[in-house]
From Swiss-Prot:
The keyword ATP-binding applies. The gene is dbp3. ATP binds at residues 122-129. Residues 316-462 form the Helicase C-terminal domain. This is ATP-dependent RNA helicase dbp3. Residues 1-38 are annotated as: Disordered. It is found in: Nucleus, Nucleolus. Keywords: ATP-binding, Helicase, Hydrolase, Nucleotide-binding, Nucleus, Ribosome biogenesis, RNA-binding, rRNA processing. One of its GO terms (cellular component) is preribosome, large subunit precursor. GO terms for molecular function: ATP binding; ATP hydrolysis activity; RNA binding; RNA helicase activity. Its EC number is 3.6.4.13. ATP-dependent RNA helicase required for 60S ribosomal subunit synthesis. Involved in efficient pre-rRNA processing, predominantly at site A3, which is necessary for the normal formation of 25S and 5.8S rRNAs. Residues 109-285 form the Helicase ATP-binding domain.
Length: 493
């Protein structure tokens, strides 16, 4: 989208009598999207399913699909891998290790295979990478005859953290071979020369916003041919201040030929505004409850809250590890501050536990080593700050322990979301102290919404929810929906 197109799109309402180029482009784009949906051939085995069975599947998995195109034909969810559209390669072979698609995959795959723009709102650990990854690879397979020039990727996936970017890259690599796709992973802390080399032949670029923008600015990558764009964990990227970087990255990408996918755990006004700016007639797929309401925890996670005194936490942590950890089972222990994480890591090492740490003071190589040790079992306890609370997909985390409660209940939900992933049961234990009582009301709401037991000691702190605060304005802050038109105010003479 060029700067001029963007301006035309945002000012279209002010000039209703004359259609701008921007308006025409949006109209053309919608027509193209509708045409693409018609090109999606639904697997015949889906046609034979009774509508009642489809309705039951959507209801039982709390799937809500909202289409901005009123005349669009509803597409049936892909309930089984056997319902996937035909493929000329062995792209689907790796799926044999999975039992069935997750809810977000079932609901979004037909839409994404059909070329629609999609907003996916779902909890972490719900299988989002394959939800957007499989249609991306199918798109590359279908366009094999078109030769791409060096440094011109067909697909770009933007992620908030290097750890998540690496995770997405690794998972896509497993499926990329059969279609001959090359996947590059781009993030800061690595020499640009090495990254320029892999960008030369990459069909798919998985990147963090800052480094991708740097390489874009110095001419190392041309995004003018991107046909598939994914913004993964969009809410997290905006929280980290990447909004302008994202806009700059998207600016040279084609409008009418680009399919845009956005995945997010929450749906605040700032994310809605970004979606309305860059997406064309998107379909919104929501898994679970109202995403604009209070944060909701994964109901498969058993949440236990223990109210303790601050000086009791270290001793209780050791007791919990001895009680719940067996053999090489993985445990994530979250701390609030970097120095606290370092202290807890050393404390557990002195007690004979195999421990690794990950926090902001560590170099990139040190983080990689810690994560690798945890994944391979060389370390069975990972002590982390919130830098690791979102985006990391470490299989089979047995238990999450919150040594110190985070600053917000949203961070609490993201922390405990490291367990109970991909349909598995999870377990999270939180050590809550009087110094955390400002968060007691919000925590009680999360526990109740997930059907968890609320301890009497926690109820004694009260159920009042602390008023949301802005980083700069504190409590004097109103969460305004910027997508709504401003109210016109007329002053008398």
């Amino acid at each position: 989208m060029t700067k001029r197109d963007y301006q035309n799109d945002t000012t279209a309402e002010s000039r209703p009598t004359k259609k701008s180029k921007g308006e025409k482009k949006v109209k053309e784009t919608k027509e193209k999207k509708e045409k693409k949906v018609k090109s999606y051939v639904q697997n015949p085995s889906l046609d034979t399913l009774p509508q009642a069975e489809i309705d039951e599947f959507l209801a039982s998995n709390s799937i809500k699909i909202t289409d901005t195109l009123p005349d669009a034909t509803p597409l049936r969810p892909i309930i089984s891998f056997s319902h996937l559209p035909e493929c000329n390669s062995n792209l689907y072979e790796q799926l044999n290790s999975f039992k069935s698609p997750t809810s977000i995959q079932s609901a979004t795959w037909p839409l994404l295979f059909g070329g629609r723009d999609v907003i996916g709102i779902a909890e972490t650990g719900s299988g989002k990478t394959l939800a957007f990854g499989l249609p991306c690879l199918k798109k590359i397979e279908d366009s094999k005859k078109k030769k791409s020039k060096p440094y011109q990727p067909m697909a770009v996936i933007i992620s908030p953290t290097r750890e998540l970017a690496m995770q997405i890259h690794d998972q896509l690599q497993k499926f990329a071979g059969p279609v001959g796709a090359k996947v590059a992973c781009i993030f800061g802390g690595v020499r640009k020369d090495e990254q320029r080399e892999v960008l030369k032949t990459a069909n798919i670029v998985v990147a963090t916003p800052g480094r991708l923008k740097d390489l874009q600015n110095d001419g190392s990558v041309d995004l003018g041919k991107v046909r598939y764009l994914v913004l993964d964990e969009a809410d997290r990227m905006l929280d980290k201040g990447f909004e302008q970087d994202i806009k700059d990255i998207i600016q040279p990408m084609p409008v009418s030929k680009r399919q845009t996918v956005m995945f997010t755990a929450t749906w605040p006004p700032v994310v809605r505004e970004l979606a309305s700016t860059f997406m064309s007639s998107p379909v919104t797929v929501t898994i679970g409850g109202d995403p604009s309401a209070d944060p909701r925890a994964n109901t498969r996670i058993k949440q236990v809250v223990e109210v303790v005194k601050p000086h009791e936490k270290e001793g209780r942590l050791v007791q919990l590890l001895k009680q719940h950890q067996r053999g090489a089972e993985k445990v994530l222990a979250f701390c609030l501050y970097k120095k606290e994480a370092t202290r807890i890591e050393r404390f557990l090492q002195s007690r004979g536990f195999k421990v690794a740490g990950i926090h902001g003071d560590l170099s990139q190589q040190e983080r990689f080593r810690s994560l690798d040790a945890f994944k391979t079992g060389a370390a069975t306890v990972l002590v982390a700050t919130d830098v690791a609370a979102r985006g990391l997909d470490i299989p089979a985390v047995k238990l999450v322990i919150n040594v110190t409660f985070p600053l917000t209940v949203e961070d609490y939900v993201h922390r405990i979301g490291r367990t109970g992933r991909a349909g598995a049961e999870g377990h999270a234990i939180t050590l809550f102290t009087e110094t955390d009582k400002a968060q007691s009301g919000a925590l009680i709401n999360v526990l109740k919404a997930a059907g968890q037991e609320v301890p009497e000691e926690l109820l004694k702190f009260g159920g009042t929810v602390k008023k949301k605060q802005h980083d700069a304005y504190g409590a004097f802050f109103k969460d305004v929906d910027t997508t709504k038109a401003a109210t016109k105010i007329v002053f008398d003479d």
